[in-house]
Regions:
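Short hydrophobic beta-strand motif reused across regulatory alpha/beta modules
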Residues: 44-50, 93, 105-113
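Generic amphipathic, hydrophobic interface segment in small proteins and small subunits
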Residues: 29-54
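Histidine- and aromatic-rich ligand-binding microenvironments
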Residues: 6, 19, 36, 51-52, ...
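A short, polar/charged loop-to-alpha-helix boundary motif
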Residues: 51-66, 113-122
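ATP/adenylate-binding site constellation spanning eukaryotic-like Ser/Thr protein kinases
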Residues: 8, 40, 49, 58, ...
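The conserved cystathionine-beta-synthase
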Residues: 13-31, 38, 73-92, 97-100, ...
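Bateman (tandem CBS) regulatory domains
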Residues: 1-11, 59-71
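Structured N-terminal alpha/beta-domain signature
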Residues: 49, 63-70, 83, 96-97
Length: 122
């Protein structure tokens, strides 16, 4: 099973020009510690709740946050077990999926990966 087949549509990315508060609200709503950030279709990086709390100004645009070192993603043809390994290695709650031009395709939550691993992918 490839990453592109595991994408969930219920967790939308936030846009680079949106307020940081919106990202934090979505993380809370979806019970995640990370959320993908995009600029149109281009993947920018993975915003963590820790980055938000360190920044400490929720009304600012997400574009004010430095994403260097937080650009974790897998390619769309990455195998399921490699996606699980990636999630574990970087201690993520969600894994962004991109094509080879870094266009954002969607994301896979840790819960979804665990459900599949346990055979409960319904």
């Amino acid at each position: 099973m490839k990453a592109i087949e595991l994408i969930q549509s219920n967790v939308p990315p936030v846009r680079i020009n949106e307020p940081i508060e919106k990202a934090l609200n979505w993380m809370d709503e979806f019970k995640l510690n990370h959320i993908p950030v995009v600029n149109n279709t281009e993947y920018v990086g993975l915003l963590s709740d820790e980055m938000v709390y360190d920044y400490n100004n929720l009304s600012d645009s997400i574009s004010k946050i430095n994403f260097i070192g937080n650009q974790h993603f897998v390619l769309e043809n990455t195998h399921f077990f490699q996606v699980v390994s990636f999630l574990s290695k970087f201690k993520l709650t969600i894994v962004p999926v991109c094509d080879d031009q870094k266009n954002y395709k969607g994301s896979i939550s840790g819960k979804k990966l665990l459900d599949i691993f346990c055979g409960q992918s319904g």
